[in-house]
Amino acid sequence: MTRRFGLVLAGLLVSGCSAGVPGTATPAGTASVGALPGDVEALGELVLTDVPSGLPLVPDDELEPPAGPKTLDDVAGYSDDVEREEQVLTDYGYRWGWERFWRDDGGLTSVFVDQFESADGAESYAADLARNDTDLYGGNPDRSPDGLPDGCSTLAVDDPAEESGLTAPTVFAWCAHGPFAVAVAVVGDSSDTALAEVDQLVDEQLDRLPRG
């Protein structure tokens, strides 16, 4: 499986990124729950557009590869073994995904939402992301975190290794929600602060997604 966040993090560090766009509540950020998205653009309308910390949104095209809409081929391209990853994602029933990032000095937040043909595919993918990020960053994941629904797990990296690419305490969350897999990461001043924001972000993002 791909180590998706780590590769995009490397792109952020290389690009430096501009100051970004201040977060505001746009129609995408206040979308109501309805039918399952029928295409990637409809999925993008359900992804959060601002974050509780107020970090500015990073324009999609300032990242390499760009954030925003993702195809199966895009996500497979994060892997060292693209052909195998394409087969895994196909087996999971991957349809499309969306990435969004917010960044300022010392702070970074990411939200990935991926849609699958079935809840089983989303659950398998979320579990794979959790396992691979845990292997990469170390630590012991919490598979029944307080305050988050069933199907979610979290990982707190209090003192990241220099080679990890993380610059400060970081908290990850991975959730399966119907046919959706949601991955959230927050780099903050402390793991407690990051965890509080992760919990809020997960709740807000899941509230925007239908279960199908």
What are these regions (language model features)?
Residues M1-L7:
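Bacterial N-terminal signal peptides that target proteins for export
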Residues G97-W102, P169-H177:
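Short, surface-exposed beta-strand/loop micro-motifs that present aromatic residues
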Residues V187-G212:
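Surface-exposed amphipathic alpha-helical segments
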Residues S110-F112, P179-G188:
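Short, well-ordered beta-strand elements
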Residues P37-V40, Y78, A119-F172:
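Short Gly/Thr-rich strand-loop-strand
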Residues S18-W98, V202, L206:
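N-terminal "mature-domain start" segment
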Residues R95-A127:
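A short acidic-to-branched-hydrophobic micro-motif
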Residues L13-G16:
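C-terminal motif of bacterial Sec signal peptides marking the signal peptidase cleavage site
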